[in-house]
Amino acid sequence: MKLLIMCEGPNELKIINILLENQKLKFSSDDLLGLVPYHARQIKSSAAVKAALNLYPDEVHVLRIGDGQNEKLEIPSAYKDKITLVEKYCTKPELEMLLIISENLAAEYEKVKSKTKPKTFAKANIRCGRRRYDNSTAFYEEYFGPDCEKLV
C-alpha cells in the first residue's frame, strides 16, 4: 500500500514537503506513491498522478490537502479498485493561520477575525526578515524551511 498525497495548492505542497524533509510526519517519502506529494485537485487532470497510479500495482490511500471542503474527489473507473481510501484534510480557515499562530498573533487576530481574513491579517502583520508576507510559495519556504518546528 502506498499513500497518494494530493495538495490543492502550491503552498500546501510546500508545507508538506518541508514536513517530509524534516521527518515530522508519521510516514516518509518511501511510503508515497512516486516518492513525492503532488500538486493536484483531481486525478483526471494530473498526468503525473495518473502515471504514478499506472506504474504502481497495489492499493493506494489518497490524502487530499486543501481549503475546498465540498469538492469531491472523482476517481476514474480505471482506479476504482486500486484506491481503497480517500481522506480529506482541510486547511480552513486559511493556511495563513499557521503563520499567525507561529508569530503568537492568534489573540490579536481573534479581535479582528469577524472583518479580516487571515490572508489580509498576515499580509499586514507577518514578516520573515525584511520580507513582508506575500502569499508566495517562496515565503513559506523562507519562513518554515529553516525552522520547521514552527509547524508542529
Q: What kind of region is each of these model predictions?
A:
Residues 7-9:
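Extended, compositionally biased accessory segments flanking or bridging domains
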